Amino acid sequence: MLRFVVGTYTHLIYGVDADIERKKCKPLWLFEAHEGALTALAVDGIYLASTSSDETIKIFDHTRNVQIADVSVPTDIANACIRDMCFTKNHLLACHDNGQISMWSKGSWLLVHTLKSSSHKGITGIAVHPSEKLALTVGGDGKLRLWDLVRGKGGKVLPLSTIPESILFLNESSFVIMSRRGIDAFKLDLTSLFSFSSKSQLNALCLYQSKLIVGRDNGTVLVLDTSDGKILHEFTAHKKRVKSVYPVDDYLITASSDGSVCIWDKDWNLVIEHNIPEGNRITCMVAMLADSNSEPKNVEDEAAKRQSLDSETSETSSESESESEYYSTSKQPPVKRTKHA
């Protein structure tokens, strides 16, 4: 069973379980998660993080359908809208429109670092090295920046020939930078590996089956060789622009701005197509394996805490909803356990 979650321009998060064997999709939840358009999602284990133009981050346990944290960005950051974020082993990283990076400790959601740069044009993409000791970012100022994640400091700044949109590590020794019309691959010493240009605008990229997957404005998906950038395969995935591409298990999931989500096998055959409710334009997507038997650690203690909190809430409020009711009708999570700056 696969699970994908999309964020929309209309402030909504929509979660769906996809049964590959039966080729059926089961909607799990559709709710208003933020006060602005969703700009990024990130997933790691049980944690699902969402952010939007309202400059907040919310953390959900997607295995139990409950919000577990409401993380605010540092109060001294102006223009704090987040364009990209990702998890590492111990942290959640978020990139802001003012060129800064915030780091929170995973689990406690306490702010541990604010990495600052001289740029005020915004970071649009971040890639963390497999060692998790350094990160690379790109942004609206057309520069590549190196960050030391161990010491929490910025490093080298290098100008690029294009305005980049996204960045991705291919392995420990190479990475790719995507702009609207092309892709450039480099080694860590900045030796060029290959360059690829496209007539149609590029919107999304990921690694899948050791190949580079690129989603384009014309609805097509390109499969590129990571060694030389040559096109290995090309197929039409959607009628309109491909907004997101995401690998999970042996499958590739693509999402279009028109609200359609498609699951493809390793031979590029369409397995399942699902459409989110009409009028909700997709802005971002993540996917994961959905294991009905998986539970977070200390689940009994957490369940007891949640029951206690629910009891306290029922004593002070005349309105009460179960978690299942919330995920079909409510706009706010049933439980907000922590809030950190």
From Swiss-Prot:
Keywords: Repeat, WD repeat. InterPro entries: PAK1-Kinase_Regulator, PQQ_b-propeller_rpt, WD40/YVTN_repeat-like_dom_sf, WD40_repeat_CS, WD40_repeat_dom_sf, WD40_rpt. The keyword Repeat applies. This is Shk1 kinase-binding protein 15. The gene is skb15. Residues 297-309 have a biased composition (Basic and acidic residues). GO terms for molecular function: protein kinase inhibitor activity. One of its GO terms (biological process) is ribosome biogenesis. WD repeats lie at residues 33-70, 77-114, 119-157, 197-234, 237-274. Negatively regulates pak1/shk1 kinase activity leading to proper execution of cytoskeletal remodeling and cytokinetic functions. The keyword Repeat applies. GO terms for cellular component: nucleolus; nucleus; preribosome. SMART domains: PQQ, WD40. Residues 293-341 are annotated as: Disordered.
